[in-house]
Each structure stands twice: as structure tokens, then as C-alpha cells.
Amino acid sequence: MVRPAQVRALSGLARSATFVRLLPSQSQNALRCASLPVSRLGALPLRATTQITSAPLRQWHQIRNSSATATASLAEQAAADPEGLSQAEIISNIDAEEWKRISKVRNIGIAAHIDSGKTTATERVLFYTGRINAIHEVRGRDSVGAKMDSMDLEREKGITIQSAATFCDWVKKENGKEEKYHFNLIDTPGHIDFTIEVERALRVLDGAVMILCAVSGVQSQTITVDRQMKRYNVPRISFVNKMDRMGANPFKAIDQINNKLKLPAAAVQVPIGAEDEFQGVVDLIRMKAIYNEGPRGETIVEKDEIPEHIKPLAEERRRILIETLADVDDEIAEIFLDEREPTIEQIKAAIRRATIALKFTPVFMGSALADKSIQPMLDGVCDYLPNPSEVTNLALDQKRKEAQVKLLPYGSQPFVGLAFKLEESNFGQLTYIRVYQGTLRKGANVFNARNDKKVKVPRIVRMHSNEMEEVQEIGAGEICAVFGVDCASGDTFTDGQLAYTMSSMFVPEPVISLSIKPKNNKDSANFSKAMARFQREDPTFRVSYDTESEQTIISGMGELHLDIYVERMRREYKVDCETGQPQVAYRETIGRRVEFDHLLKKQSGGPGDYARVVGWMEPSESLEENKFEEQIVGGAISEKFLFACEKGFNLACEKGPLIGHKVLGTKMVINDGATHMTDSSEMSFKNATQQAFRKAFMESQPHVLEPLMKTVVTAPIEFQGDVIGLLNKRNATINDSEIGVDEFTVYADCSLNGMFGFSSHLRAATQGKGEYTMEFSHYEKAPGQLQKELVQKYLKAQADRHKK
């Protein structure tokens, strides 16, 4: 509530639209009637402005100058004290025309477990918003495939591999009013091997729709997506899909969101019928029945009469909704304690506040395949997910030791944008950019913060899957794609006025590798081109060259991940490849504390090598990291040489002496040493440290570590015994299991080495009805027999190379 004193204080300058944004909508409307917004006045033609008397003209200049001063002041505070600057203050200073645009923008992603219906739902969204004229299904039964699956591979396999970006407009109709919203929409993969695509999408989005299956509820990849959303503070609404499936139970899914994801959730709808008899939903906020009519459900019919048999359920679930909101929102809590009934507006406002604050997710329900209840979910995106100005975005100022700064969603501010995805198109490299601050214009020069390289932006396009639409400029909060900008995924661009960089995305380490080479030497040039392009596009796809085996090694997140790239090379570059057996990314670690006193001494007449290092090695506190410490007293080794020692330690950790894999969980301490006046050098100390490391490591009873994978297997219930048997054969540790109406799920930790070929065995054991996902969990000591085999194999390979 706005008090009279506040309204008086907000008179004068505060009546301009630039200061009105903090007030509730009723007060905004009252104040806006009192004066013409600054931006509109500034846009009047000359003959109109000349008719304004001198006093109002002076007042207008004062208002305009005051607005510019306020923006400059906020920009200073955003850099000096980002935590002290609230989003409310930022929003209050947005120009009226800019607010009109940005308040109706929603940057949203659709994410979920594989086969939950993400792409099917997106296809309906595009159809109902008028972006496409016909609906095509995912698995290409009509030989077309879903619009958002633009790669041939995606259409064949029925999965989404890359994040497809599109935009569409949705007209929200309520109480006889129509409001047009602009969606930038990203459809993401559900398969765990393509998790980097989900990471990249969530990094640049302001909100998300989390889709769950009404039968399976929260699944393994749902938990991964939840973790990613929490990492990037992405608010979400939830949509329980497949309500027409046998065994559909949306309330089980809601319980799992509450219990498994630890996120307060409540239904904002209840179904009218279920399974084959699913007809529509009841809106619990307005207590209206909603049905879809028309050949593809394009017509929404609302009825005040709720079916009698649904009323008790609707009333019970509405009570639960209000109780849940009372736990996460102070205003509803106060109303609840006073035993008053909240109004529709109060409930909707509370859901919006709690959702944006990451305290709550409203749950919608429907069936994308049956064309039911998608439109109310789109209204939910408008009502409950934030616009770009309501989300805090931070950058790092390189000129101030990477101090955090808050970005302002103002078109007048210096441009800052993030390249979050790269694609190769027929017209060259396509770079997807999210504009966080300022305006990106066609023909403008932008600077890459990573290498300070200046590039010109020749074309700006909005993408619709693999089609495009050219635009002249893109404002703050929008997503676009540009041509002719050479960069890497995760690069920050500015207009040169600021030395800002965005914090980078989390990129998981690869867990599987294999050797690869083209079958024909004439394809080597295309092979190299493909490798370079795939690395630029996907940070989880790594390429290296093993000098000892003289092989090119590719590494990634799983077998499917690498298979897709091998297949893409064949299709897109006409390069057939030979691949070796998949190799597990083992690690090595120290077994116990070992002391060392190592002297490197080489003198041959001229300048020689001399370095003595003394200290010890021991297991570090965390298995995940290596640690180097110096405890030199009295300057026995100079700072310059100690830096070389640390470099030698890091190099030694890259390739362990036991089986040639990276070293983890090892700490090295140097506490004494000696130097020679002429023969000591940085190279001497680097080499001495590496030699001391190798010797001490092999004396420490070292261990091989193998990656354990968090594995989730789902199959029809009649195959439970066969699946458990398959896992036991692979020495899996079964952590948990769930039994549903017609299927069961097993959660286990499995050795990656034992899981090669598991997919074909699972298909055979379950008649093709089982599915599984694997995600890296942690490293654990390998069995003694496996370690012995790996060491023997490594020693034999070393001996064979020496013979050559």
C-alpha cells in the first residue's frame, strides 16, 4: 500500500515514468496520468516541442537531466557497491519506452529428463503462438520431425542434441484484456551426455519450464537439471506432462518435487479426468474449468461450472496451495493467520514473488501430445517468471582485480553481452549472444574481453531453429545470433568502454576417451577442420594428441556423446573415421606420506644444472585437488626458483608415473634446498621437482583411482530381476530402488569400465524397453587386480616404445 505521504514525496520529478516503477500498478496509473513520460516528450517533432512554454520546457530539461544523473549514479553504485543496489532501484530508473519492451520479454528454457516431452511441448508452444503452421512429432512419423530438432541425427534418434533457440509472441487474454509478450525460447537436450547444452541455456535464461512425466515424476536427469537451475539461480514453473498416459499421477510428481528436489511446490491446477479420460484442468486460483477445443486444441474454453466430482479435490488442492504459499510468502502468511481468504490478485502476486525468489514452483499439468492445457502454462510463464530487469546479473571488472559489478538492463549503458553458443551454418559461424546491458547494433564494433580483439558485427538475426530473421538492433535482455564474429563459447563482448567479463559456465570434466583417425589420409584437412569446429562449439568435447602413441584422442561425457561427433564428421564433413576402444579417464593418487631429498647436478664444462629440493609428499585434504606448499625459512631457495618448483609439481601431476594418467589428491611440501651461484636456474628446479615427485610417488604405495558413475536404470517391472542381475555382474553398488505402477527404477554406483556395452545388454534383457543414464559421481580406489593389469599394460607400452 502506498501511503499519502509517499505519494506527495513522489510528486514533481517522481511523476515521470522513470521513477514510477517502484509503485504498485494502481499508483503508477494515477501518477502517469499527471505527466507525459520523459522519453515520449523527447520524441515529439520540433514543431510540437516549440509550442511548449518556456517554464515547462525548463522543467522537462531538469527532468531529463535528473534522469540521466540518476542513471549515472546507479551505474557508479553498480560498480562500487553491487550488493547495496537492489533490483527495485534498478527497475525504478528504467525509461518508460524501455520498460514497455523489457517488461513483456521472457527468456525461458524448457528442460527435463529425456523423453519427458520437452520438444513435443515446444512444438505446441510454437504452433499456438503462430510461429509454425503445422505440428510435427518428434520421431518423424510424418517424415518431417519436430521443428526444433533441426539436425538429421536429432530427427532420426528422436532426441534433442543441441539447444535450439527460437522466438515467438504470446497474447495473454484475461478479463477482456489482451497483453502481448515476447518469448525467447530454448529447447534443451534431456540426455545426460549433452548436459553442457543445458548448462549453456540456463546460464543466459531468466526463467525455465521444468517438465516432468506424470507417470515417472522426478527422474535422474530431472535432479541434474534441478541442480543446474539452482547453480544459476533460475526461477521455474513446473509442467506435469503426459496426463493422458496410463498410471498418470501429477500429485506424486508434486510430492517428489517437494521431497526429492527440496523445493516447495503446489498445484495451481487439478486434472478433469485422467489417463484416457483426461479432458482439461481446473484453474485453482480463479476456480474455473479450462478445456481445449478445435482440431489441435487451439481454442481455449473457460467455464465457471466445475464438474461436481472434481469440486472436493479442487477445494482441497486450493487450500494446500494457499498453505504452501503461507510458508514462503509473508503477505499470504499474514492473511492466512488472520483467517482471511486471499484474493485472486494476492495469490498470483505471492506466486510470482516466491517463484522469482527461488522459494516455490507452481505446478501446471496437461498433455502436449494430446494438445491439452499448453496455453494456460504459457499464461503462467507471463504471470510468474521474471522479465530480464528482475534478475540480478553480475560481471567481473578486469581493471579492478575482477571485482563484481552489477549489470544494468538499460539501452543507454555501454554494451555487455555473452556468447553462449556457437554453430556452423551455411553462411559461416553463427554466434548466439545474450545482451545483458546496452544495445547491440548491426555494423557496430565490439571487443572480445578475452583477447581484446575488435570485431565488426555485419549481421544480427533472430533464430527460429535453423531459420533466421534479420534485425537492425537488439536491446538489453534479449537473445540474438550474429555472423562473422570469431570467438569461443563463453566469451564476453563489450563496446570497448568497459573491461568487464561474465563469470564462465561450469564445464564438467570428460570421463571417456577414444583414439580416432580418418580412414583415408586425403581427408586429413577436413578431419582437422571438424575437430577445431566441434571443440569451439562444445567445451566438453576435448581433442588432444598423444605423442607417445602418435594418436589423436577425443574425450567427452559418454559413449553417445562421442558417437554423435563421429557420426557428424561422416555426415557433415564426409570423413569416415576409425576409432579405438573407449578408454576410461583413470586417476592416480599417493598412498602415504614420503619424505624426499633430491639433488639434480649436471656439470659438463659450461653452464650446468644444479638444484636441491627437500620436503615431503602426502595425501591432500581433498581427493579432488592437488596442493603445493613452500615452507622455506631463511631463503634457501629464492622466490623465483620456488615458482619453478610449483610449475614442476603441476606438470608432474598431468601425467603420473604409475599408469600415465593425471594425479589427484596429492600434496607436496618443500621446506629446504640449495642453489648454486652459476649453475642453478628455473629449469633446473622445475626438473628437480618433477624427478623428486616421481621418485617419492612410486615409494608411497600409490593407488589407481577409477571413475564411479551415478547410474539410473528404468524398465518395466517384469524385468526387475534381469536388470539387477546385469548390474551385479558389473559389481555395481545399488543405493536405492523405486517401484511404480508398471515400471521400476534402480539407483546405483557403477564403475565406468564395467559399463561399456551395457546399453546393448540392457536392450536385450528388457526387449528394448529399458533405459538408463550415467553421470560422473566420484573417483574411488580401483580393485587390486584392475590396478595390477593397468600397471602391467602401461609398463609394456613403455617398453615397446623404447624398442622403437
Swiss-Prot record:
Q: Where in the cell is it found?
A: Mitochondrion
Q: Which residues bind GTP?
A: 112-119, 187-191, 241-244
The UniProt entry, under InterPro entries, shows: EFG_II, EFG_III, EFG_III/V, EFG_IV, EFG_V-like, EFTu-like_2, G_TR_CS, P-loop_NTPase
Keywords assigned by UniProt, alphabetized: Elongation factor, GTP-binding, Mitochondrion, Nucleotide-binding, Protein biosynthesis, Transit peptide
KW Mitochondrion (keyword) present? yes
The main place the protein resides is mitochondrion
Q: Which CDD domains match?
A: EF-G (cd01886), EFG_III (cd16262), EFG_mtEFG1_IV (cd01434), mtEFG1_II_like (cd04091)
Q: Which GO terms describe its biological process?
A: mitochondrial translational elongation
Example of a GO cellular component annotation carried by this entry: mitochondrion
Pathway info: Protein biosynthesis; polypeptide chain elongation
| Listed Pfam families | EFG_C, EFG_III, EFG_IV, GTP_EFTU, GTP_EFTU_D2
Q: Name one GO molecular function term.
A: GTP binding
**Known PANTHER family for this protein?**
ELONGATION FACTOR G, MITOCHONDRIAL
Similarity comment: Belongs to the TRAFAC class translation factor GTPase superfamily. Classic translation factor GTPase family. EF-G/EF-2 subfamily.
Q: What is this protein called?
A: Elongation factor G, mitochondrial
Q: Give the originating organism.
A: Talaromyces stipitatus (strain ATCC 10500 / CBS 375.48 / QM 6759 / NRRL 1006) (Penicillium stipitatum)
